[in-house]
Amino acid sequence: MIRVLAVLISVVFLAACNGAADLNKAPVPLGDFNLVHNIAVAPKAVKGPLSREVSKAQLTKALTDATEERFGRYNGSRDYHFGMSIEGYVLAQPGIPVVFAPKSILIINLTVWDDAKNVKLTEKPHQITVFESLDQGPVVGSGYTKSAEEQLKNLSQNAAKAIESYLVKMNKEKGWFRGNGAPAAVVADTDA
């Protein structure tokens, strides 16, 4: 009985870990948000030890595609821009099943701009580190089960989900995407 319960919990946990798992649902509330420019660069991207090789163009395209896939669902009236810099990555190679299953990692820096105010919302770039989803081959490793492109797509989708989570947090804490883009306290003052 305990084993069955553990398996069920594991399945639910694995499903929840994929950055693209919720794309078929309505987007999480993010205020009056519309992404206009979605720019990724990789001038200093560091390939981690034992990583598979991908080009900088592949890195940036995967991240911009995943970001568009997630944020293209928002259609608010206020425009915002993302500047994303890929700082490092590891695309896991095949390991030794069960004993050593390397994991893939992506590290990015995010800058968010408010178009109407022409200001940067992130005082300094916000760093995000994501790992591959656990459904990518937790026992044998994604190096055996996925191509480098598939690993990169998964990491990029996880990064886009992490960006969304960060923006939801900042909107709640600082009111980044409220009706007029001002923090909640300022909105209350201007409505009076």
Language model segments and positions:
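N-terminal, post-signal-peptide region of Sec/Tat-exported proteins
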Residues: 53-79
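A structural "domain/chain start" motif
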Residues: 17-61, 172-192
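Short secondary-structure boundary motifs at beta->alpha junctions and helix caps
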Residues: 47-53, 119-162
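C-terminal/domain-edge helix-coil "capping" segments
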Residues: 139-192
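Sec-exported extracytoplasmic/periplasmic mature domains
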Residues: 64, 68-72, 91, 160, ...
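Surface-exposed short loop/turn segments
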Residues: 75-122, 133-145
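Short secondary-structure transition/capping segments
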Residues: 19-32, 114-134, 161-176
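Sec-dependent bacterial lipoprotein signal peptides
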Residues: 1-18
